Structure formats: structure tokens, C-alpha cells
Amino acid sequence: MNSVIVLDFGSQYTQLIARRIRELGIYSEILPYHTSAEALRERNPKALILSGGPTSVYDAFAPMPDEKIYELDIPILGICYGLQAIAKHFGGEVAASPKREFGRAQMNIVRQNELAESLLFKNIPDSTVWMSHSDKLTCLPKGFHITAQTANSELCAIEVTEGEGAHRIFGLQFHPEVHHTEFGEKLLSNFLINIAGITPDWSPQSFIDSEIARIKELVGDQTAICAISGGVDSSVAAVLVSRALGDKLHCIFVDNGLLRKNEAEKVQEKLKQLGLNLTTVDASELFLSRLKNVVSPERKRKIIGRTFIKVFEEHIHNEKFLVQGTLYPDVIESVSVKGPSQTIKTHHNVGGLPKRMKLKLIEPLRELFKDEVRKVGKLLDVPDEILTRHPFPGPGLAVRVLGSVSKERLDVLREADAIFIDELKKHDLYLQIWQAFTVLLPVQTVGVMGDNRTYENAVALRAVNSTDGMTADWARLPNDFLAHVSNRIINEVRGINRVTYDISSKPPATIEWE
């Protein structure tokens, strides 16, 4: 299979690069920035991409690739920090920009002459690109020339033109992998298909086939258990692994007391439709007792992760493997296991797990984004009712009840959230939104109901649109709709007298509040 390797220098967008490549039908793999040239040669990639990163190339411990990668006979593309690393290696100069550039910028193509069009920018006009950098290239390396510029970055795109490897090393100061770059997909296609000569041969079906074969070989005659919640991720993971293991996969559904209204009953009904080997465990009292008086979201996540494992270990027999529906966004927001990406928060499926666990992990979806998981699920005949569910965090409502968690506070949140979701479905808005939910805030506010003064809870409604969970924009729901939802919640849910709507995008905010 043709493949592309992305070296991770710490950008929060690194996995997006891999995703965009896969959208072109080409398999991509992310490796640490320090992977040796020899190790890369053994993998035989058809192209190499250097990601962006949060550091400066002049920092004392700035990550730098093996210098011998430039001797590999494959095209190389550097993005943002990747461009700067290439430029520094070849003798160019990088300096702190007097004006940092974050967001959209107008890019203008620079042509040496009418007959010397850059292969990278073939059929790409002047257009909008997405910038996210503090440093910038100030002096070209010898043998390179400019192919694009912006008002603040005169050396916005460069490529080599002399000596061995002509038209084989390229650099971009902007991010083609981000949707805001108008012709980002076309640019990556030019690099991978036209320049590297790669024939697309990767697809969700080929992923399924290779993953089933991998799991069969990994598990052999042993057995596995699956932490299944009824959500998209765990359900698709369970069905995929069951295709490899059959009855050797034992699925465990844990009612942790942190689910949405009537969710436990609905989940069990849906899972039976999948024909999975299922055991249900009611551990709600255990989870709530361990979360009593815990306020820190990080502690909540770690407690929930440890408790999940404890419950599993009490209900296993001879299983040696644990299946989880971990996705790329889970990994990137917790810690980059493949490079120096900065940690945002611990995810239940990743860093929240105890280090000394008896079960070996199988994470079949770890390299996929949410939309790719849905495509895989569709091919595996997972019901649409499951595939269209909005994302739900592993720690459940514990991270939507801000502050301490109790059954009483959870019940208040459940009722409010049920009204919000019910109205979204009634108004045919649910499937138009990536994710929607309600957050119970750790404050009480003054209100008036009838002739009485109230001092009760406030909630925040959150609805966002996204394609992959890496970036998200708040959903512009109609004002009349929001007013109707607010009115229902305040009148029908005892203990709430104020409803707010979250209009924060990601970044700078994350989708979940905790």
C-alpha cells in the first residue's frame, strides 16, 4: 500500500494532516519528529511531511529531524514549523515576526515566469489561507525560490530549484490541512498525487480489512472484553472487533450513573440489535460514591477511568485484552504519544487510565476521526440511530456537572438536557449539528417566579458544528428556538431559573466545558 509519513513536531493540527491525506485515498502514518532516516527508509513512504509545532527553531531544545531525511529520494513538504526547520537546515534565516499571524490571510501566487508554474500550486489561484505562527522565514536558503506570499509573510511558500532533488522539497508557512485554507485539499493533492506520483489505494473498507487481520493476529486464541456505551465510538469499535473475534469478544455495558435521561435502557436495547455478547453491570452507586465532593475535572476523569477498570476486572474471566473506542481527537487533546504536542486535558480513554492495568489495550479506531468512524460503521451495518448520535464524553455527565457531582445535581441536568435534545429533534435541527448538550454551572442566581424570589441553578446550552472535532464553531440556532427551550427548561425543571447559550468556538475554547 502506498503511504505518506507525517513527522510530528507538536502541532495540534498534526492529525488533521493525516486525515486530509486519507480523504485523498492515501494511507498516512504519524511518527515522532526524531524518527531516523533509516527507519523511514525501511517503511518505504512515497512522501514525507513535516508538521507545524509550538516552538521556535532557535529554542535551546527545538525539535529537529534527522538531517539525513533530506537525502531520501522522496518529496518533502514542510508546514509552518516544518518550513522553518527545512529553511534552517539549508542555511535560511528565521526570526520572530514583528506581527504575529493567526487566522485568515490573503495569499498571492508568485511565478518566476509564465512557463515556470510551481507544480505545488498548479491550478491554484490567489486565495485565502490559514496562518498560525509567531516566527517567519526572513531569508531564503540557497537554491530555493518563493512561490507564494502574504502581506505579512513575504516568504510564505518556497521550493528548491537547484541541484539534486529539484522540485522535491517544498515549504509552506500556512496550514493547508485546515478547512479555512481555500485550496488546501488541492494543494495536498498536487503534492501527493502529481509530485510524489502516489496512486490512491486507501479507503474505509481497506482499513476494516487490515484492522480485522491485525486484531486476529494480535489476540490469537485469547479473548477480549469491550467497554461499550452505546455511543458511536464504542459501538463501532465493538462491531469491528467482533468481526475479528466473534464470541471471543465479551462486551460489558456499565451503567455508571452518569448517563443521560433513560439512556441505560435505550443503550441496552440498541446493543441487542447488534448481536453482541453483552453483560450489563449497574455500578452507579460505586461511581457516585467515589466522585463525592470531587471538584477538579482532572480528578473526575482519572477516578472514572480507574473505576471503569476496577469494574471490568471484577467481571472478567480469562480475557487478556480491553477494547476501547479511542479516536484521534482523544489522543491529541490528552498528549501526543508521537510527538511534543502540548497537552490540553486528559481523556477518559487515554491518560485517565491507571498505568498498572492487567488488560492489554486494543484501540481499533485510534487513528480515525469521527466522520471516518461513521463511514466505517456504515460499512459494518451499525444502525443509523447509533451512527447519528452526538458525541458523548467517556466520563459522561460528570464533566457536564461543573463542581461536585451528586445524584440530585445529575437529575437536574438530565431533565434540562433532555428538553434541549428533544426540541432539537422536533425542529429538525439535531442532525444539522455536530454536538449539543447542557452544562450545569457551579453557581446559583437570583430570579423571580410569580411573587417569589428564587435563588437557583443556572445552565448553559452548548451546540457546535464541526467536521472532525479538532476545530468547532458555535451553532447559530434561531433566537426563537433558544427562547422556547429556555422557557421550557425554567418552567419544567425544578431548581433552574436561568439559561445561557455558549457562543465560544474551538479554539480558544474546547467543546466540553471540562
UniProtKB/Swiss-Prot annotation:
Listed EC numbers: 6.3.5.2
Binding site for ATP: 229-235
Pathway note: Purine metabolism; GMP biosynthesis; GMP from XMP (L-Gln route): step 1/1
Annotated Glutamine amidotransferase type-1 domain residues: 3-201
Keywords tagged on the record: ATP-binding, Glutamine amidotransferase, GMP biosynthesis, Ligase, Nucleotide-binding, Purine biosynthesis
GO CC term, one of those recorded: cytosol
Coiled-coil positions: none
Active-site residue list: 80, 175, 177
PROSITE patterns on file: GATASE_TYPE_1, GMPS_ATP_PPASE
Protein purpose: Catalyzes the synthesis of GMP from XMP.
Subunit structure: Homodimer.
Listed name of the protein: GMP synthase [glutamine-hydrolyzing]
Gene giving rise to this polypeptide: guaA
